[in-house]
């Protein structure tokens, strides 16, 4: 009787456990399905907020993802269900019925869960590859080994390779899963009274396991094709891509591997039928031995046959490597020119006169100091911040000028009282931009602002800003709620604030359902219960412009340095560069980031007030972007970028650095020179503001290139030979509308000695007077900050310019341009201004930059030259008198002032 009561309780407990397990499993499945559905709905309403024209992108992705997931789920469910059923049958044959496995519902639940997880992974990784495969386009370039169009490797091969690899690793997982499940169930049945591993000795269990192992080798046959094609990306020896050993040894190894694998599979099936599982294991291990043997043979062949005469063997393969790498990074279209540099003397006044536009645009303000000054004197309130200062070109009073333009964004760390109302309802946006000339400073040595202050003031011909509010920005990220019962703070005005209410296109209406959704998404219960929110309120989300673009088109890579412009209507518009990349371009050397092909094919314009996005194709020859256009026809705008924006865009620094980095080696097109690394280049170096030595970053400048008729904005970088400091070449990228993206490489003649930026920096340090002055200014509570050294081609000479900042030695000090250093062909001078430095360099007074637009008669009068010795003497006396006055040496001051007065009396 006692036993029966015990049995009843145990059976009841089992039923309860099974029911609870069943309910939990169903809840888990429902939770997964609900989570997927909720994520899709949330993504849809976010896409609608960004732009209804992008909804077609969402639905295209949704249908493809759904198709991939449904098909893969059905296949995976079948695989797991059948595998589990075989395991159940074998276990119950060995140990008898197991109550846990009595019904098939557990098998269904486990199979559904595993299939959901695996199909979800496959959907996320396969959908875009399927779309690009389906809409693939040719590059019209064939690889030299398999004679297939590059489009096959970029669009088709990745799709098939992903499927084959997924199946391969799936079967491996099933094998491991099967073994583990046998051991666990066997141990569960006997509750540790026997060795759980003993189940693996059962004939039918081993039959099941070895059947799965044979499947691995069957799928392996299909991977061989893609592994052989993968040699186009190999690094065996000195060649990127197929080399001599790859072509004659490893490719033949893969061809023979087909025969070996077929033999392994047939023998395994034969022994499987005979039940000789030990023989199957030996056959399978023999294939591993074959793989090891192939590696040994290839390595030995490379070492003993190829390496002793590698240059000869690899020559034709190096030619392929060079050709395809240059194609992949668009180096083939670089126009190479020789720059007949004149190193015989310094620059002349005539040289300057012939390059007036270039001289007028010589940059004497730098990014770090300009940004520091902006955050000191144009921030006004701690809840504003300048995150960046970007370079652009604008026509100011009829002349092209390079300017710094910086957005005054909202800074949530600086909000005075971090209440919910302040952070979400009142402090919602930044205000305006500041624009300063890169070529001029105030008498105090600070940037000359031509757009400044709050409210905005546009001076000296600068463009007017009619909508200064920045709701979407570079670092503007947290969500805010607008059109509530609380007015927004627009900008400070006296002792109070000007208020504002948003009337732009951005935002999602906060209906009761949307309030519930976003309170859950942001884990913010206050959003649900706040009485300040009404039926007109909208929530502004995805306000980071980069994340906003990624939300619509995640398949592009985006520049991390967007820049802001002022369009023809006075609205603020962000420009974000988008890149198409792949790591599947054959025979191309990859970058450190892993890709081996890049194009700047897309520019995204984002309205800073409305948050609207417009995608423009700027490289219509790029097959990758044309594939995306075929997939998503509604994503891109028809036509070109509007002229009022296009005239200000610039070639991106990111892709320029990538191309220049590759060019350091791949400018060598002769395979013998390339192999011997006879002419490796490096970027020029300079001294940073903290005194350390680093590579010169590419820099923008408005200048007239050699053989050009007018000034245009270019991005340039100098090259030096590797491990040597003389300058050997420089690369320029054009940003004008008619020449946008054209690259020109200027090479100096062999045998000419052109001082590099670092050598000029050393000359500055070694100049007795300059070194003395810099050391003196670096004392007594002040510090000297050396700006970026710029190398500028003027006629047939290289002119170097470096601004010198002086700042008080405290955190709140404003760096001010107090001196400008100029150098050319070994002569180094320092002046109180750019004109002064250039005057000393040429040995006579030069025309002030600001007077270049005067009439010819005025120009002639201005350029009448005083004797340079008198000018230098007057300047020297003035500096000595000023120094004596600062030191309180009245006797010396009187003496120098009298000498100066006497000289001035003789000046007509």
UniProtKB/Swiss-Prot annotation:
It is a multi-pass membrane protein. Keywords: Cell membrane, Membrane, Transmembrane, Transmembrane helix. InterPro entries: UPF0182. It comes from the Bacteria. It is found in: Cell membrane. The chain crosses the membrane at residues 22-42, 62-82, 98-118, 166-186, 208-228, 253-273, 286-306. PANTHER family: UPF0182 PROTEIN SLL1060 (PTHR39344:SF1). HAMAP family: UPF0182. This is UPF0182 protein Csac_0864. It comes from Caldicellulosiruptor saccharolyticus (strain ATCC 43494 / DSM 8903 / Tp8T 6331). The lineage of its organism: Bacteria, Bacillati, Bacillota, Bacillota incertae sedis, Caldicellulosiruptorales.
């Amino acid at each position: 009787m006692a036993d029966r009561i015990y049995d009843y309780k145990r059976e009841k407990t089992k039923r309860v456990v099974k029911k609870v397990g069943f309910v939990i499993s169903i809840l888990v499945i429902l939770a997964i399905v609900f989570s997927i559905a909720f994520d899709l709905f949330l993504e849809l309403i976010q896409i609608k907020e960004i732009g209804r024209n992008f909804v077609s992108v969402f639905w295209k992705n949704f249908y493809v993802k759904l198709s991939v997931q449904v098909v893969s789920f059905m296949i995976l469910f079948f695989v797991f269900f059948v595998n589990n059923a075989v395991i159940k049958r074998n276990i119950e044959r060995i140990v008898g019925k197991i109550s846990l496995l009595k019904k098939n519902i557990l098998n269904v639940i486990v199979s559904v869960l595993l299939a959901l997880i695996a199909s979800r992974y496959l959907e996320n990784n396969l959908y875009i590859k399927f779309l690009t495969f389906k809409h693939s386009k040719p590059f019209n370039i064939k690889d030299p080994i398999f004679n297939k169009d590059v489009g096959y490797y970029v669009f088709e091969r990745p799709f098939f390779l992903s499927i084959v690899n997924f199946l391969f690793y799936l079967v491996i997982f099933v094998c491991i899963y099967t073994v583990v499940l046998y051991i666990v169930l066997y141990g569960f049945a006997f509750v540790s009274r026997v060795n759980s591993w003993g189940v693996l000795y059962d004939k039918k269990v081993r039959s099941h396991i070895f059947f799965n192992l044979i499947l691995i080798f069957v799928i392996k046959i299909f991977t061989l094709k893609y592994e052989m094609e993968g040699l186009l990306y190999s690094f065996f020896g000195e060649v990127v891509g197929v080399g001599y050993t790859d072509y004659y040894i490893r490719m033949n190894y893969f061809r023979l591997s087909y025969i070996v694998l077929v033999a392994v599979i047939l023998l395994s099936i034969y022994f499987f039928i005979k039940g000789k599982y030990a023989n199957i294991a030996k056959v399978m291990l023999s294939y591993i031995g074959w793989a090891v043997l192939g590696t040994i043979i290839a390595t030995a062949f490379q070492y003993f046959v190829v390496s002793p005469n590698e240059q000869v063997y690899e020559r034709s393969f190096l030619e392929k490597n060079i050709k395809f790498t240059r194609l992949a990074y668009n180096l083939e279209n670089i126009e190479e020119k020789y720059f007949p540099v004149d190193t015989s003397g310094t620059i002349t006044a005539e040289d300057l006169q012939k390059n007036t536009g270039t001289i007028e645009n010589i940059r004497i303000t730098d990014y770090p100091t300009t940004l520091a000054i902006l955050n000191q004197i144009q921030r006004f309130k701690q809840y504003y911040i300048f995150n960046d200062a970007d370079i652009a070109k604008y026509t100011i009073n009829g002349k092209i000028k390079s300017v710094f333009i910086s957005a005054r964004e909202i800074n949530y760390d600086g909000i005075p009282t971090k209440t919910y109302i302040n952070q979400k309802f009142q402090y919602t946006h930044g205000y305006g931009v500041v624009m300063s000339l890169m070529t001029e400073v105030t008498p105090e040595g600070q940037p000359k602002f031509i757009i400044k202050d709050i409210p905005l003031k546009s001076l000296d011909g600068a463009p007017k800003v009619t909508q200064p509010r920045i709701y979407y920005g570079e670092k503007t990220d947290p969500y805010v709620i607008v059109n509530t019962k609380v007015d927004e703070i627009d900008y400070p005005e006296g002792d109070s604030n000007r208020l504002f209410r948003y009337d732009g296109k951005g935002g999602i209406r906060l209906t009761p359902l949307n309030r519930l959704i976003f309170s859950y998404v942001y884990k913010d219960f206050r959003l649900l219960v706040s009485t300040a929110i009404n039926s007109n309120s909208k929530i502004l989300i995805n306000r980071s412009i980069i994340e906003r673009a990624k939300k619509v088109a995640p398949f592009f890579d985006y520049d991390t340095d967007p820049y802001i412009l002022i369009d023809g209507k006075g609205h603020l518009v962000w420009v974000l560069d988008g890149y198409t990349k792949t790591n599947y371009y054959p025979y191309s050397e990859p970058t450190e980031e892993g890709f081996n092909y890049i194009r700047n094919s897309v520019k995204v314009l984002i309205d800073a007030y409305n948050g609207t996005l417009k995608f423009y194709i700027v490289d219509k020859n790029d097959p990758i972007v044309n594939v995306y256009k075929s997939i998503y026809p509604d994503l891109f705008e028809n036509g070109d970028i509007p002229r009022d924006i296009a005239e200000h865009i610039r070639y991106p620094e990111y892709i320029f650095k990538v191309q220049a980095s590759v060019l350091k080696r791949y400018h060598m097109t002769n395979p013998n020179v390339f192999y011997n690394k006879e002419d490796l280049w490096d970027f020029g170096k300079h001294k940073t503001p903290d005194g350390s030595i680093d590579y010169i970053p590419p820099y923008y400048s408005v200048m007239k290139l050699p053989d050009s008729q007018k000034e245009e904005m270019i991005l340039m970088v100098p090259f030096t030979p590797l491990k040597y400091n003389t300058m050997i070449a420089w690369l320029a990228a054009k940003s004008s509308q008619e020449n946008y993206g054209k690259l020109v490489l200027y090479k100096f003649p062999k045998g000419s000695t052109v001082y590099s930026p670092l050598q000029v920096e050393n000359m500055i340090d070694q100049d007795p007077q300059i070194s003395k002055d810099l050391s003196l200014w670096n004392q007594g509570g002040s510090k000297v900050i050396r700006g970026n050294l710029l190398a500028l081609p003027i006629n047939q000479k290289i002119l170097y310019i470096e601004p010198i900042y002086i700042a008080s030695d405290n955190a709140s000090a404003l760096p001010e341009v107090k001196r400008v250093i100029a150098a050319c062909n070994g002569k180094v001078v320092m002046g109180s201004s750019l004109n002064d430095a250039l005057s000393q360099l040429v040995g006579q007074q030069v025309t002030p930059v600001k007077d270049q637009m005067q009439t010819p008669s005025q120009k002639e009068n201005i350029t009448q030259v005083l004797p340079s010795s008198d000018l230098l003497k007057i300047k020297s006396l003035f500096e000595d008198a000023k120094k004596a006055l600062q030191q309180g040496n009245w006797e010396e001051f009187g003496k120098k002032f009298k000498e100066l007065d006497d000289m001035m009396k003789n000046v007509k």
